[in-house]
UniProtKB/Swiss-Prot annotation:
Region (Disordered) residue spans: 103-136
Gene source species: Ralstonia nicotianae (strain ATCC BAA-1114 / GMI1000)
Protein name as annotated: Probable septum site-determining protein MinC
Function of the protein: Cell division inhibitor that blocks the formation of polar Z ring septums. Rapidly oscillates between the poles of the cell to destabilize FtsZ filaments that have formed before they mature into polar Z rings. Prevents FtsZ polymerization.
Biased composition (Pro residues): 127-136
């Protein structure tokens, strides 16, 4: 008596976390140069993440060479999986061969294929933050379980990457880099580069007891030390967070 053969595959609805890249220029040379400048030295930033390309912020007469952007992203270890476009942009946007996605990163209803069987939600849009309030002490932000703790100073050229929160108990020197998917806590001078929320966590923060960094970044929004830090924060305890897609510096109260 024959038994029913088990299927070798199935196609079903699903979800995959994805980042959302929104170019604001169709000048691919400039865009590629800026992406390379920001991320070529931090290959862990994307680490083979999937990414949706949102072209809706481009002007009506602009057409981005998406195939070239995909090539640039691939070189930075990011994998483009679709394009978010307005109805007017749809024709040229999908000419690159990537599927069209809706504003949430999902393939529109009624369009199904093996290549796009799984719907892909985009990273959440930033939610406007409430009016600024007095800076809370460090204890106000819960540390994620399994935080990485570094007890030695980080010298120039050293780089540390944490999947959750990162705690550094000694100096982060010029040229050193601390990267975390969660929050970053530096209980010493922060003189190098600190990148928190690198997987798109808009709630991530950076805390340090002496603010002197070359660069700070939260969820890809960054500021460099080329412009002097405000006197109220330079070489002082501070925390950095996002508010309405802008980096906000606040004094850190030490108990």
């Amino acid at each position: 008596m024959s038994q029913k053969k088990a299927p070798l595959f199935e196609i079903r609805s699903g979800t995959v976390d994805a980042l959302l890249l929104s170019p604001r220029t169709a000048d691919m040379d400039a865009l590629a140069a800026e992406l390379t400048r920001r991320f070529a030295d931090t290959p862990e930033f994307f680490s083979n993440d999937v990414i949706a390309i949102d072209v809706r912020r481009l002007a009506a007469d602009e057409r981005l060479p998406i195939d070239r952007l995909v090539e640039t992203l691939t070189g930075l270890r990011a994998r483009a999986i679709g394009v978010v476009a307005s109805p007017e942009q749809a024709e040229w946007a999908q000419a690159c061969g990537l599927p069209l996605l809706d504003s949430h990163g999902r393939r529109p209803r009624g369009e199904r294929s093996e290549e796009a069987a799984e719907a892909v939600p985009a990273a959440a849009e930033p939610v406007p933050a409430p009016a600024a309030s007095p800076a809370p002490p460090v204890e106000a932000v819960a540390m994620q379980p399994g935080a990485m703790i570094i007890e030695k100073p980080l010298r120039s050229g050293q780089r540390v990457y944490a999947r959750g929160d990162l705690v550094v108990l000694d100096l982060v020197s010029d040229g050193a880099e601390v990267i975390a998917e969660g929050n970053i806590y530096v209980y010493a001078s922060l003189r190098g580069r600190a990148l928190a929320g690198v997987k798109g966590n808009l709630d991530a923060r950076i805390f340090c007891t002496c603010l002197e960094p070359q660069l700070i970044s939260i969820a890809g929004i960054y500021r460099t030390g080329e412009t002097p830090w405000p006197e109220a924060f330079a070489s002082k305890p501070a925390q950095i967070r996002l508010s309405e897609n802008t980096l906000v510096l606040e004094p850190l109260r030490m108990k």
